Amino acid sequence: MSSYDNHQALAGLTLGKSTDYRDTYDASLLQGVPRSLNRDPLGLHADNLPFHGADIWTLYELSWLNGKGLPQVAVGHVELPDTSVNLVESKSFKLYLNSFNQTRFASWQDVAETLTRDLSACAQGEVKVALYRLDELEGQPIAHLHGACIDDQDIEIDNYQFSTDYLQGAASGKIVEETLVSHLLKSNCLITHQPDWGSVQIQYRGAKIDREQLLRYLVSFRHHNEFHEQCVERIFNDILRFCQPESLSVYARYTRRGGLDINPWRSNGDFSPATGRLARQ
């Protein structure tokens, strides 16, 4: 359980509440959640973050009307910088996108500019938006996260409560540079406690991290309640704190919900995330 799940900043969210679905444009549907909510307990401050990164969203259910009333469809790619004041709450994002459905826009550029303006205002940061026609994405192969998968270990687990204890003494010995991947990440929505399923890629240079301890740590998120972005920052912070690598990058790709998937990454080095969708996305 997070220490801030009853914070007043969450009280006004539509998440977990019955809502009306509007199909005409309404920017007020967007709701932001302060990033400071989970960063403050971790000792992370906006003016001295130990990482850089972004939250990459894929919008699969995006439709509007053109100037003549003909429906248009697109796949959207959105990037929120980790330096934005707020993250965007996903249910509000879905409701906001639904409000485009019966709204006429003069051009695709008009749609992209509207999304950029509204999301930047909600996040209080510079958001990037790109729209893709379906024929631009047809034939796109299923991607995979590069690295050594740590999931097929013959270990017994009977505790699924979140704990950083699994990382105690996890790094020792010679300096290595490696990339590890797990598809067993499961956390739960901070408000509704619905399951969030993801794959995580951890790239680091430093003392070798024990793979069993790392996997036990990741599995301990199974009953943990936080938003996707917050989980990635927690993983980054915990590995940095306990394993003290020289460089570290953490990237998670979560399965979609409500036509949206969220793929946050954080790094203190040179890292360029692969943006192709995975098998479960």
UniProtKB/Swiss-Prot annotation:
What is its subcellular localisation? Answer: Cytoplasm
Q: Which reaction does it catalyse?
A: 7-aminomethyl-7-carbaguanine + 2 NADP(+) = 7-cyano-7-deazaguanine + 2 NADPH + 3 H(+)
Q: In which pathway does it act?
A: tRNA modification; tRNA-queuosine biosynthesis
The biological process GO terms on file are: queuosine biosynthetic process; tRNA modification
The enzyme class is oxidoreductase
Task: Summarize where NADPH binds, as residue positions.
Answer: 90-91, 257-258
Q: What is its EC number?
A: 1.7.1.13
User: What GO cellular component is one of the record's annotations?
Assistant: cytoplasm
The record's active-site residues are 189 (thioimide intermediate), 196 (proton donor)
Positions contributing to substrate binding: 88-90, 228-229
**Known role:** Catalyzes the NADPH-dependent reduction of 7-cyano-7-deazaguanine (preQ0) to 7-aminomethyl-7-deazaguanine (preQ1).
Subunit composition? Homodimer.
Q: Which NCBIfam families match?
A: QueF
Protein name (record):
NADPH-dependent 7-cyano-7-deazaguanine reductase
- Biological source species: Klebsiella pneumoniae (strain 342)
Native organism taxonomy: Bacteria, Pseudomonadati, Pseudomonadota, Gammaproteobacteria, Enterobacterales
